[in-house]
Amino acid sequence: FASVEVGWRSMLYLTVTGRNDWASQLAYSKNSSFFYPSVGLSAVVSNMVNMPEWFTFLKVRGSYSKVASAFARYLSNPAYSFNNQTHNWSKPSTYPAYNLKPEDTKSWEIGLNARFLNHINLDVTYYRSNTYHQTIYAPLPSSSGYNQVVVQAGDVQNQGVELALGYNNKWNDFTWSSSYTFTLNRNEIKRLAAGEVNPVTGETITDNEIQKDWLGASNVAPQVILRPGGSMSDIYVNHELKRDLNGNIEIDPSTGNLSIAETDFRKVGQLSPRYTMGWSNSFGYKGIELGAVLTARIGGLTYSATQGVLDYYGASQATADARDRGGIPINYGTVDPQKYYSAISTAEGGYGAYYLYSATNVRLQELSLQYTLPARWFRNKARLTVGFVAKNLWMIYCKAPFDPEISAATDNAYYQGVDYFMQPSTRNFGFNVKLQF
């Protein structure tokens, strides 16, 4: 690793870095190492030209970087797996992949830092990155002795904006510090493996989608499907209540039952938020400091398999309310709640089209109050601060039946904000004492 930084007259700064890594995953590749550089240039405009008196500082910057990372182990040298229950060894199902390349991410960004009116500071960044050589699995015929082979392809682009706006001021003994942050990211799949050549069969790959995990315990849940032009978190559903030619939900006239039809996959949204925001404030007066942090996640969907299971067994608040109302309004009448919920839910979860919720939420993330005792009490030789802090204190707005920010910590198959009988989010309270000499 090497890094060089050059400055000129406190106006221009150039930074160049280079790094070379050797990875054991590349043991059977032509190149057993990979190099990735970066370069950044910044200019302090306020030191180069005369600025208005109220504009105290302005710096613009730009950078380009390439980051490489090795793929998962055993792709180039698959290992046999041992079953602790049957005490049998099984051969790998993935064809050994040779001459693999590291996954590359090429990115650039531009931004500025500004301070003006003596109290306001602004930091804005725009970035774009593309990731290549991703690991994609292509199917193999059973005659090969394997199920799949690794193909390195794809192009996934991320671009977005990060903004931070701050304000600091003091009036005699009263101080106020405020900070607002805004982040926006747009993710797009530019290309998958279609058009690449299968290294084993020599055939051109035509599949142009990748079906990822179901967002629950069974295939009644929504599914994440990757397609060119979409994002890495697009949600699709393929089960809905049967409808007639006029679009009305079909109800069996003799039994009053409803039924689910399997349909083509239909995109209904994505897991990722449209943007996120945060606003923190700190107020101080004669040793007393009050702080508050508000956060907001806007957009995106979330799925609750828990709600589906509770509805199926008639144990949810929704089923109780439906019984009290005398039924579920459908078409021009009502349907028995038991028949409705037994149609759209199962013992393992709910059909995705009916158990997706907006992940938008606004909360009071943190509230703190602290007091610093007068230094004269300690003969000006020490400072003692006592404080109280509460986190995740108040969910101001949330339409989902659970906290959309929770995530499973033990199973990678579930995404953040997907609920399958997970532990509820917690509200924390703390007390702290800080002594400084």
Question: Residues of each region from the PLM?
Answer:
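Outer-membrane beta-barrel signature, preferentially recognizing the C-terminal barrel domain
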Residues: 1, 77, 81-122, 149-171, ...
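Surface-exposed extracellular loop regions of Gram-negative outer-membrane beta-barrel proteins
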Residues: 1-27, 32-47, 57-100, 105-108, 118-122, 128-153, 190-193, 408, ...
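Short loop/turn motifs that connect adjacent beta-strands in outer-membrane beta-barrel proteins
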Residues: 11, 46-58, 119, 170-176, ...
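Extracytoplasmic gating/loop element in the C-terminal half of outer-membrane beta-barrel translocons
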Residues: 23, 297-385, 389-391
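C-terminal beta-signal and terminal closure region of outer-membrane beta-barrel proteins
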Residues: 71, 90, 153-158, 202-236, ...
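Outer membrane beta-barrel strand-and-loop segments of large Gram-negative receptors
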Residues: 95-97, 101, 127-171, 242, ...
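Conserved small-residue
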Residues: 151, 170-271, 399-401
